[in-house]
Regions:
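Cysteine/selenocysteine-centered motifs that mediate thiol-based redox chemistry or coordinate metal-sulfur cofactors
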Residues: 2, 8-37, 44-46, 135-161
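Glycine-centered loop/turn motifs
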Residues: 1-4, 103
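CN hydrolase (nitrilase-like) catalytic-core segments centered on the catalytic cysteine
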Residues: 16, 25-125
């Protein structure tokens, strides 16, 4: 895997969205910058195969899916709430080399609640309904901190000894 050199924010079919991969979900800044540039949605393609001690030689994808769904929900819920946007996760499915991928999809609303899930450990598709009204409401809520960011303070912290 190689790191990218840009953060795409795309407008298509009336929606503005950010795009990221796997490890990007651990960086709140990526979601924040996309939201500041108008993103209402964020899509993340994941290639997570679980921790080594949790991967069974039989390729038990259901066990891996359970682990990944729990971890991703913690991260993605916060990203959605902070930025007032929908977030969608899709993980690779099946075997690649010696690794098994759990094949799950998650759809998280701007309030951080799960609105759709496919986590059977098998290939599948997730279909859910989204609305701009929910995004507009979320972006004006107290939980959404996109407009409360203070880069003037973050750039020059006061070090107290």
């Amino acid at each position: 895997f190689h790191s990218g050199s840009s953060l795409p924010v795309v407008t298509s079919q009336g929606w503005t969205f950010g795009v990221g991969i796997c490890f990007d979900v651990r960086f709140p800044e990526i979601f924040r910058v996309a939201a500041q540039h108008g993103a209402e949605l964020f899509f993340v393609a994941v290639g997570g195969s679980g921790h080594v001690d949790q991967i069974k030689p039989s390729g038990d994808q259901k066990h891996q899916a359970k682990f990944h769904v729990k971890e991703m929900m913690q991260l993605v819920s916060a990203r959605s709430i902070d930025n007032g946007m929908y977030t969608f996760i899709a993980n690779q499915s099946g075997k690649s080399g010696n690794a098994w991928f759990p094949g799950y999809c998650l759809a998280v609303a701007p309030n951080g609640k799960l609105i759709g899930e496919h986590s059977t450990g098998e290939e599948g598709m997730l279909i859910t309904e989204i609305t701009k009204q929910i995004v507009k409401k979320a972006k004006t809520s107290a939980e959404c901190t996109v407009t409360a960011v203070r880069p003037d303070i973050y750039a020059n912290p006061v070090i107290v000894e």
